[in-house]
Amino acid sequence: MKVLILLGLVLLSVMVQGKVFERCELARTLKRLGLDGYRGISLANWMCLAKWESDYNTRATNYNPGDQSTDYGIFQINSHYWCNNGRTPGAVNACHISCNALLQDDITEAVACAKRVVRDPQGIRAWVAWKAHCQNRDVSQYIQGCGV
């Protein structure tokens, strides 16, 4: 019985952790999903963004007490503007999706929402981590050796 409980806890922790992409695996996935060059943004910039926002973790979340919003998923997309979590006051939900969709191992919906974000006037500058860690920097290291 103890073994079954322990096994259940281990499986639960794996399910909660989500998928943490390997760097080149994510680069290939983002390229396949059409992010390389989307709105003039290089694949290396998207990779830098994902590294600094979530460390390539699909289940990453970050609560923002100021506006009571939460950032979700590999791109840390915010519930105040882009998705609906049912808890953020005055949420816009411009991507027309549940925030939980941004936490899936299959990042297709997260990529579609990220594309929606960069269509706004701020573009990729909407992400603070991109401005702090990627803007005006050599970001080639994020795709180096990946063959993309």
From Swiss-Prot:
Subunit (UniProt): Monomer.
EC number(s) given by UniProt: 3.2.1.17
Free-text function comment from the UniProt entry: Lysozymes have primarily a bacteriolytic function; those in tissues and body fluids are associated with the monocyte-macrophage system and enhance the activity of immunoagents.
Catalyzed reactions: Hydrolysis of (1->4)-beta-linkages between N-acetylmuramic acid and N-acetyl-D-glucosamine residues in a peptidoglycan and between N-acetyl-D-glucosamine residues in chitodextrins
Primary location recorded for the protein, binned into one broad class: secreted
SMART domains assigned to the protein according to its UniProt record, in alphabetical order: LYZ1
Organism lineage: Eukaryota, Metazoa, Chordata, Craniata, Vertebrata
Protein name: Lysozyme C
Active-site residues annotated for this sequence: E53, D71
Keyword annotations of the record: Antimicrobial, Bacteriolytic enzyme, Disulfide bond, Glycosidase, Hydrolase, Secreted, Signal
Key word Disulfide bond present: yes
Family membership noted in the UniProt record: Belongs to the glycosyl hydrolase 22 family.
GO MF terms, alphabetically ordered: lysozyme activity
